Amino acid sequence: DEGCLPDDSSRT
């Protein structure tokens, strides 16, 4: 989910 979810910014 790269850039799919807003929380993804934390997963980089």
Swiss-Prot record:
Domain of life of the native organism: Eukaryota
Residue ranges of every copy of the C-type lectin domain listed in the record: 11-12
Entry keyword Secreted: yes
Keyword Transmembrane helix: no
One term under GO cellular component: extracellular region
Keywords: Hemostasis impairing toxin, Platelet aggregation activating toxin, Secreted, Toxin
Compartment(s) where it occurs, according to its Swiss-Prot or TrEMBL record: Secreted
Tissue-wise expression: Expressed by the venom gland.
GO molecular function: toxin activity
Function: Snaclec that binds to von Willebrand factor (VWF) and induces its interaction with GPIbalpha (GP1BA), resulting in platelet aggregation. In contrary to bitiscetin, it does not bind to the A1 domain. Instead, it interacts with the collagen-binding A3 domain of vWF. Also interferes with the binding of vWF to collagen.
Family of this protein: Belongs to the snaclec family.
Subunit structure comment from the entry: Dimer.
Protein name: Snaclec bitiscetin-2
Organism for this UniProt entry: Bitis arietans (African puff adder)
